[in-house]
From Swiss-Prot:
A GO term for molecular function: hydroxymethylglutaryl-CoA synthase activity
GO biological process: acetyl-CoA metabolic process; ergosterol biosynthetic process; farnesyl diphosphate biosynthetic process, mevalonate pathway
Species the sequence originates in: Fusarium sp
Entry keyword annotation includes Chloroplast: no
Protein name: Hydroxymethylglutaryl coenzyme A synthase
Amino acid sequence: MTYPQNVGIKAMEIYVPPQCLDQTLFEKHQGVSAGKYTIGLGLQYMNFCTDREDVCSLALTAVSSLLRKFDIDPKSIGRLEVGTESPIDKAKSVKSVLTTLFEPHGNTSLEGIDTIHACYGGTSALFNAVNWVESRSWDGRDAIVVASDIALYKEDASRPTGGAGCVAMLIGPNAVLSLEPSLRGVYMTNTFDFYKPDMKVEFPIVNGHESIACYLGALDECHKDLLRRTEAAKKQLNGDAPKTGKKVLDLFDYMAFHTPNCKLVSKSYGRLKYNDCLNSTNAADWEGIPDELRNLSYKDSLKDKTLERALVAATKTEFKMRVEPCIAAPSLCGNMYTASLYCSLISLISNIDLASAEGKTIGLFSYGSGAASTLFGMRVTGDLTNMVQKIDLMRRLKQRNIQTPEDYEKACALRLKAYGNKSYKPLGDVSSLTPGTYYLKSIDEAYRRTYAIKGQ
């Protein structure tokens, strides 16, 4: 077997629920100032689910659609791995439910299970799949990686940053989006910025301000680690590797970020600029950033609003060209936890000039509270046009049903009633589901879930 080349994403599909909440209406409903969510967080709409959809139904819909749209033979898949932080069972994996899409075709030889670590699980599953294809264990088949989640909060202040969705990715050689193994920075640590210790409820415990600082701090450390790795690689190759310099932003043409909210993405890009400036000996790199902000202590720099605003302003033009396409869809969808970064990636490729995209490098930042993070690179190694056309994300988002805050609150109440329950018949309306969507039909007395498919 020849060594596989250009291993990465060969195809992608995304599924979002058919209903969404207008954040402008939600601002009025919650009695906050106009623009707090739409401008302050950069969020226009938010996907949400009733009790008819769960992490498994979202995944079933996305994977079945991926197989259908891209004419993938279920027998051609040798690994199936799920990243999620919304499990409905402490032992039985979401992946086990997805085997129902493959077993009827005679395929029960499917490696991989679920990977759980907050919003980072999808990225870990992606790396596992790529490593499998590049390993001696590879049997020549492709892999599918699934990132599926529902983000729901108890506190009113956090609810605007909810959302729901699933991204499924076909992984293999000769991909159109290939991972760049030389472009990776990793940071892992122990934090309590966001966690879910109460198994009786769907809600997390969140320290919002600490979580933002943890996110930005992780980005800083990934920046450092990526530079350390690229410099080490150059030394190992006796200087034969292309020079990367000391600026991480010079390594990428575009960027996509894990997106709890869109405002955090603009702060993050500015933060990368700040780290590049700290590593630079060229005074011109600090242009637009006042002198008094250049020597802040590290702790102060994470929370200094004047520095934050200066960095966002200094990178505004670059951000618009290199990053803004990645938040077009997240601003209309909200947070999808593990699927968030990959929704951003789909948004990016759906909103750039594909004619000139081949050969470009995309930087991606993945963060999961607790905390796990990686800043890594992908290269466009093929024509993305077919994939973007088949995903058709931006058009599909316009077809959702915009519902009222009262409808959203009712849906939340249904989910609260259903969570952890048995002998339960879901009450949510299925009429708005599109044909081919999987939904929860019932939960029996032994907690076993039955799913149905919306017909024509």
